[in-house]
A protein has these predicted regions:
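Cofactor-binding loop segments of dinucleotide-utilizing enzymes, especially the Rossmann-like FAD-
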Residues: 94, 117, 169-170, 227
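Hydrophobic residues at beta-strand termini and immediately following loops
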Residues: 5, 115, 225-226
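Short acidic active-site motifs
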Residues: 101, 179, 232
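Residue-level signal for inorganic ion chemistry
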Residues: 5, 95, 146, 193, ...
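Nucleotide-state-sensitive switch-loop elements of NTP-binding domains
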Residues: 12, 21-52, 56-65, 70, ...
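Conserved C-terminal guanine-recognition region of P-loop GTPase G domains, centered on the G4
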Residues: 154-163, 167-220
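Canonical P-loop GTPase G-domain recognition
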Residues: 197-254
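Histidine-centered metal-binding segments
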Residues: 2-34, 255-291
Length: 291
């Protein structure tokens, strides 16, 4: 949880803490804990609003999290190549600078909105809301939110997504779930990417990586995938198709689901999180739609 480095203040919410803003109060250039709590409460409100939009339009929103270079963008490219003809997809890309990843996605014929976060090491719900103004939600079935490459902060911020997917690439080492538990506890699915490198990176043991994951009491599926070998994305594609079907069912029943927000972040979220922090698969009644 970034409660000391100040990166809770992002381009999406800085208007709330500027002079005259609703929560304008700082100490020694860093946001006070009470201000951070207020910002997170505002973030949670905006996330609920985002989720209402997704549910009303029948869109499944998935937040992709990983370290830099784990293969998030390449995974999206490969996914679009397979699902694109049958599933309408859009992507929100989060990076500190450049439009490189968004340009790669657009080259696949899919609408993509780039969010440049500046010094912020994660996306927040306000940033995502601003990006949604550039996306026709009636024209898509599936929205991927590619978060900033970071193994800590993204897990503590609800963006309005329905599911979290955490990537662990083979070159990173199989002990990452033990070293960075927060982001792996938040996952509804863990993908071990770059599986084609296993024969040459023999120190990486997928079974050991999964044991580290289970030691966190995670029940998330753990699948080894590769974008370079035909058929090795199938576990991911099956999971996506199942989630799309589940979203259709929830919408018909007027229900929604919330992602896991990790306790270290949730402690600062204040009253907005009371009664909302549930485990995997818990259904919630959707709030009333509004503009």
């Amino acid at each position: 949880m970034c409660d000391t480095c100040g990166c809770n203040i992002t381009p999406g919410n800085e208007h709330l803490v500027r002079d005259g803003g609703r929560h304008a109060r700082t100490e020694d250039g860093r946001a006070a804990v009470s201000v951070l709590r207020n910002l997170l409460t505002e973030n949670d409100r905006q996330a609920r609003h985002n989720r209402e939009h997704f549910d009303r339009h029948g869109v499944l929103a998935i937040n992709l999290m990983s370290s830099p270079g784990a293969g998030k963008t390449r995974l999206l490219e490969a996914t679009i190549e397979v699902l694109g003809p049958s599933c309408r997809i859009a992507v929100i890309e989060g990076d500190l600078e450049t439009e490189n990843d968004a340009e790669r996605i657009r080259a696949k014929g899919v609408q993509a909105v780039q969010i440049a976060t500046g010094s912020a090491c994660h996306l927040d719900a306000h940033m995502v809301h601003q990006a949604l103004h550039q996306i026709d939600l009636d024209g898509i079935d599936l929205l991927f939110i590619e978060n900033v490459g970071n193994l800590v902060c993204p897990a503590s911020f609800d963006l309005g997504q329905h599911r979290n997917v955490t990537l662990l690439s083979v070159p990173e080492g199989d002990d990452k779930p033990a070293k960075y538990p927060v982001i792996f506890r938040a996952a509804d699915l863990v993908l071990c990417t770059k599986g084609d490198l296993l024969p040459v990176l023999e120190d990486f043991d997928p079974e050991r990586a999964e044991r580290h994951l289970r030691a966190l009491a995670s029940v998330a599926p753990f699948d080894v995938v590769s974008t370079r070998r035909p058929g090795e994305l199938e576990p991911w594609l099956i999971w996506l198709r199942d989630e799309l079907q589940a979203q259709d069912t929830r919408r018909a029943l007027g229900r929604t689901i919330h992602p896991l927000i990790q306790p270290d972040g949730a402690l600062l979220h204040g009253d907005a999180q009371e009664g909302e922090h549930h485990g995997h698969g818990h259904f919630h009644q959707a709030a009333q739609s509004h503009g």
